[in-house]
Amino acid sequence: LRGLTLSVPKGEVHAIMGPNGSGKSTLAYILAGKPDYEVTEGSITWSGADLLEMAPDERAHAGVFLAFQYPIEIPGVASMTFLRTALNANRRARGHEELNTPDFIKLVRAKAESLNISMDMLKRPVNTGFSGGEKKRNEILQMALLEPRLAILDETDSGLDIDALRIVSQGVNQLANKDNAIVLVTHYQRLLNYIVPDYVHVMDAGRIIKTGGKELALELEERGYDWVSAEHQAASETRVAQEVS
């Protein structure tokens, strides 16, 4: 990432689009605090807190959630145990009482039903043997349970058929409200047919080079990304020429 500035207020949905290697997933990982990435300059502020001073678990407790493009399988860890541990860790961090087993099961059942997730699926280890669509729905189930204040979805539409995409999008739309923000990282406009963004940002070479409304996604679907890069390059050359003169 190089000189990237992005502001996502509560109550808004922002889509991040761009070609492969433009920095979209890097942005998602940095926001969530993935240890493999080093921030050498700049700052990240969310709800008055400096995220760069917080470990990944502290960011999660502060309401930051990342849905992975490729959710990993965790053999030997029961899905229900995983979900309850994550939920109660967040509740403790926010000063709330932990949910007992009956209340937890009731909550999970309601959330799972809204996402067309079978409770039988949750009897299996986390993501183990799940289809691509099941893994993505499981990510959204986690999001629905944790109720994050900043949800980052890294290419959640990748590998989904139309039915799975519709169900996952429905889950995201149920979460969206005036008290949280959602960042959608995607290659394709089709996700934005179901989750309508307030703003669409185009990334290239680690920078945001264009911002527009939902209509920008439609134009990108029709014309690709090259015209945006060319437009940005021309504008940059014009600025340099004006500074020299």
Give residue spans per PLM region.
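Walker B catalytic motif
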Residues: 155-156, 163
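Helix-to-loop junction immediately C-terminal to a conserved catalytic motif
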Residues: 32
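ABC ATPase NBD Q-loop/coupling interface
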Residues: 43-59, 127
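The feature captures the beta-strand-to-loop junction immediately N-terminal to the Walker
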Residues: 17-19
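Conserved beta-strand-loop-alpha-helix hinge in the C-terminal portion
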Residues: 203, 207-230
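Helical segment within the ABC ATPase nucleotide-binding domain
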Residues: 165-178
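ABC-family P-loop ATPase nucleotide-binding domains
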Residues: 72-149
